[in-house]
């Protein structure tokens, strides 16, 4: 999945900031066991990215298993200066993001949706580059 993020940014992550939304293994829990965010964040860091992260309930647990991550107070704080935002866990609040606000705070309007919670045409209307999983490109 880190390669998908890199591809959305032209193949290079070194020196770029990636915002990760959702750290727990599923929504409505603080459980980090086998959370997909752990290998994703490790791979992003191995590729040279700086990682900012936010999760509604899993922040304290994530701090004990993730190193060198800037933990943020909300999705918009997380997006500040990011070259891309990645949705890893499908929390309900991530289904109602204010894309105009995100576009203002992000370095580049790139969304990698690993849970397919948005329709590509909806995100394109907001001027974002949108990558999802298992969907044909249009």
Predicted feature locations:
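Structural/interface elements that position substrates and couple domains in central-metabolism enzymes
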Residues: 1-138
């Amino acid at each position: 999945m880190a390669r998908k993020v890199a591809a959305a940014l032209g193949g290079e992550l070194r020196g770029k900031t990636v915002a990760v939304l959702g750290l727990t293994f599923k929504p409505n829990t603080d459980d980090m066991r086998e959370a997909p965010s752990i290998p994703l964040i490790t791979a992003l860091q191995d590729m040279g990215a700086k990682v900012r992260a936010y999760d509604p309930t899993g922040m304290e647990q994530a701090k004990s298993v993730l190193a060198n991550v800037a933990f943020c107070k909300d999705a918009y704080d997380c997006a500040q200066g990011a070259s891309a935002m990645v949705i890893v866990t499908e929390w309900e609040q991530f289904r109602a993001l204010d894309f105009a606000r995100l576009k203002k705070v992000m370095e580049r309007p790139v969304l990698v949706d690993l849970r397919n919670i948005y329709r590509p045409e909806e995100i394109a209307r907001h001027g974002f580059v949108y990558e999802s999983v298992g969907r044909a490109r249009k």
